[in-house]
Each structure stands twice: as structure tokens, then as C-alpha cells.
Amino acid sequence: MDALLQLKGIDKAFPGVKALSGAALNVYPGRVMALVGENGAGKSTMMKVLTGIYTRDAGSLLWLGKETTFNGPKSSQEAGIGIIHQELNLIPQLTIAENIFLGREFVNRFGKIDWKKMYAEADHLLAKLNLRFKSDKLVGELSIGDQQMVEIAKVLSFESKVIIMDEPTDALTDTETDSLFRVIRELKSQGRGIVYISHRMKEIFEICDDVTVFRDGQFIAEREVATLTEDSLIEMMVGRKLEDQYPHLDNAPGEIRLKVDNLCGPGVNDVSFVLRKGEILGISGLMGAGRTELMKVLYGAMPRTSGYVTLDGHEVVTRSPQDGLANGIVYISEDRKRDGLVLGMSVKENMSLTALDYFSRAGGSLKHKDEQQAVGDFIRLFNVKTPSMEQAIGLLSGGNQQKVAIARGLMTRPKVLILDEPTRGVDVGAKKEIYQLINQFKADGLSIILVSSEMPEVLGMSDRIIVMHEGHLSGEFTREQATQEVLMAAAVGKLNRVNQE
């Protein structure tokens, strides 16, 4: 089968860094090509070379069989290559049609926008994707999943033959993911080629036909997905076997550190649980069940309307995140780019931001040497891959950004560490490193709450698991009792609380 798009021998270097070396990618009509690799493997750089954002240093790009060079995203877009970024590129205050044809509005012979034609064309594109809403609806009124469908419709408006999807399900519910997969199958049937960039193994094996593996900027292999197992694919990605994906540390938890009684707040109703020293408490549940809301009420980022929280036997009241930090409760957000990190600031500034009191003199000036020493220690402990602590954190991979976010929380010397989706958007190798760090904190007696949508992660790392459903606690299980089936039954409200101390 002839490829729609073929990149061969692609090299790209930046000062001091060889980002791509002999990289290759083929995209075939009517097939989904997964592009996988650890964070920093070169996937994003390859997409920027492909779409003309970066100029390649060496190699060839064949588009529809002809040697081609794109001089920017507009050039590749007009040629028929569409890209849907992880962060959606839509304006909430405009309608669907206005977003789809922004800058390309239909104009009548009097020089005015032909609204009737524009909405008709947009409705036609939505119908191609079997979507039930009309194009006169505001984008801001749509769910994230439906907004993603608008991005696909926008790509189709350019008559794109190849569509690149970057972590497309990162913010989607299971139902929205199913809808996306139906659309991808429809696009395949129309002969379009899809590039599917994802860390989620389950999705790759469900929706992709072929897979291309990158490692350290190099092309490793192209295989049919049907010929692989998850283990063999991961081994190609990381260059080694991951013997134990979830390295659980089996030690006896200590005395009760945190006690929550009848806690209520926005999206949280009458929740009670305990957390012991040196224990990992997993929090499971479906999207919208109230897991993140519970953590934010506990930490002080959302108001508590009733209930009691005691820490080491003393009642604590957290009316703000500052109160949470002052009492030894640290919350690492599920959205590190929005809530957790200042992307334009350096690794050092991000890591020490909430711990500046520890590096301040009486007069308010900073002890810069102490700050640098502490940041350097954490960079080594966490194996953060960065040229220097002065590097802008926005330039690091997702896994390294997450390590910095966790390190920042630990700099305040907390008693309770809340990790909300700690490995979201993180590759398999970096995940393993984060799990090992979590075990290290656990061994040191830190009390950890692990909130995750990935059931294998919760099952693999937790000592106990509580499940939430519609703001309530719907189940509590020991490690031995917990299975995916039991957790799912509790998550949909079909199982009563069965655990017991």
C-alpha cells in the first residue's frame, strides 16, 4: 500500500541537543498509525517538522508521492494535513460555524459574510461525523468531547487527507472516547490516514492498525499492532523490560494521621475516612464523581460547608490553600499546566515557589545558596532531566514537569501528600520513576492520597481504596478485596460500602 505521507531520515538539532536522528514515519490511507515513545522521544518535534513549524536539517518528506517542503502550518493545512492539538484551539464565545471557518468566512458578491452558506456548510461537516448538534451553537456550551468533534470538523473543512491527533482522549470521559473512536472509524472508511499520538496502551490496541516507535529521537520500528503485546511495545519504547509496572511497597501502615468525618462541600456529601502514616489511600470513581472536589475541600481550595478534619489528633480548618500548606497538607493538581506550574518560570523558581519561607531571612531577602542547594538535591533525587535549574519549565517533557510539581509539594515538608492524576500525560518510563518515588515517600512515613482514573494504577499502588459515586463514598476496600470489577460496581453505585477496618 502506498503511503499518503512518508518522512524518511529526518534529522533536527537545536543548540546542544539532537532532537531527531534518522526519524521516519509513514501514514497509510484508511489506517490509523499510532506514534509512541517516552516523553522527549521526539514525537512533538517530528510533528513540528511535518507541519512546517521547524525546518528539517536532513531527510525527505513525500506528500502524495511527491517530495515536499511545507513552510508553515498554513501551508501544510492547505495541502490537506490537519492537526488536533492536546490543548484545543477554539474560541468559546463564537459559534461552531464561526470557529470552523474563522478567517475563511464565505463572502457574498456584496462583500458581506454569507451566514446562510457558512452555517449550511458547517452543518454538513457535522453531519459527516454523525453529530446531532447544529453549528449555530456556541462552542462554550459544548462538552470537551464535543469540542474535540468541532476540531475534527474544522480539519475536515480543509479536505484533510491526513489527520494528526495528539493525546485526543486526555480530557474525555469513557463515553466521549467511544464517540471519538466511532468518528475515527468513519474517517478510516473515507480513506483518510490518522496519526494517533498517545501514551494509553489500551487505546492503541483498540483503535490503531499500525504503530511507529520513537526512542531518543530515533526511529525504532514500524509494526502492525496485531503482531504486538503491550509488554513488547513498552519494551521497544523504553529499550528495556519493565519487570513490575506497579512496584507496591508492602509495609504495615502506622497510626492514624488524618481523620475525616462527615465532610461536605461543593460536589461532596457526607464523606468520612481515615489515612495512616506510611499508607497510600487510593481514590477511585468515574469522572464527575467528586474525587477532585473532595481533595480541594480537604486542602482548602474549595469551601467546606460542614464536617470535621483532624490531623495527628488536632482539628484543622482549611479555608484556603495557604491553610492547607500551613497544616502540612499538600495538593498536586490533576492539571499541572493550569493549577500547578508557572510555565514561563524556571525549574528552580517553580520548585521553590511554595517553600520560600524556608529560604528567607528575617528581613525578607532570599538565601539563594540554600535555595539552589535544595533544588539541586531534588533534581538529583527525582532524576529530573533538565539542562539546568534555570531552564524554563515549559520546555521540559510532561514527566519531568510532573516530577517538579511533586518536588515542590515535598519542599514544604508535608504530612499528607495528595496526588491527583499524578501520571496523566506521562510516558511509561517516567510513570515507573514516579511510582518508585511514591514508594520512597511512603517508606519515610508520609501519608499519601492517590486519586487516579486508571484502575490498574489505583489497584497496583494502593494499600486501601475508597470509591466515590455522585459525591458520596460508595465503597471502601482493602488491597486484597479490590478488583477492577468490584471498583467499577462501586463507581456506578451498584455496591454498598463493604469494608471494615
Swiss-Prot record:
Under catalytic activity, the entry for this protein gives: D-ribose(out) + ATP + H2O = D-ribose(in) + ADP + phosphate + H(+)
What EC number(s) does its UniProt record assign? 7.5.2.7
Q: Where in the cell is it found?
A: Cell inner membrane
Look up the domain of life of the source.
Bacteria
InterPro entries registered for this protein in UniProt: AAA+_ATPase, ABC_carbohydrate_import_ATPase, ABC_transporter-like_ATP-bd, ABC_transporter-like_CS, P-loop_NTPase
Q: Which SMART domains match?
A: AAA
Q: Where is the ABC transporter domain?
A: 5-241, 252-495
A GO molecular function term, named singly, is: ABC-type D-ribose transporter activity
Q: How does it sit in the membrane?
A: Peripheral membrane protein
Alphabetically list the UniProt keywords: ATP-binding, Cell inner membrane, Cell membrane, Membrane, Nucleotide-binding, Repeat, Sugar transport, Translocase, Transport
Residues bound to ATP: G37, E38, N39, G40, A41, G42, K43, S44
GO cellular component terms given for this protein: plasma membrane
For this protein, the record's Pfam families field holds: ABC_tran
Q: Which cysteines are joined by disulfide bonds?
A: none
CDD domains to which the protein is assigned, alphabetical: ABC_Carb_Monos_I (cd03216), ABC_Carb_Monos_II (cd03215)
Q: What does this protein do?
A: Part of the ABC transporter complex RbsABC involved in ribose import. Responsible for energy coupling to the transport system.
Q: How does it assemble?
A: The complex is composed of an ATP-binding protein (RbsA), two transmembrane proteins (RbsC) and a solute-binding protein (RbsB).
> PANTHER family from the entry?
CARBOHYDRATE TRANSPORT ATP-BINDING PROTEIN MG119-RELATED, D-ALLOSE IMPORT ATP-BINDING PROTEIN ALSA-RELATED
- What family does this chain come from, according to its entry? Belongs to the ABC transporter superfamily. Ribose importer (TC 3.A.1.2.1) family.
Q: What is this protein called?
A: Ribose import ATP-binding protein RbsA
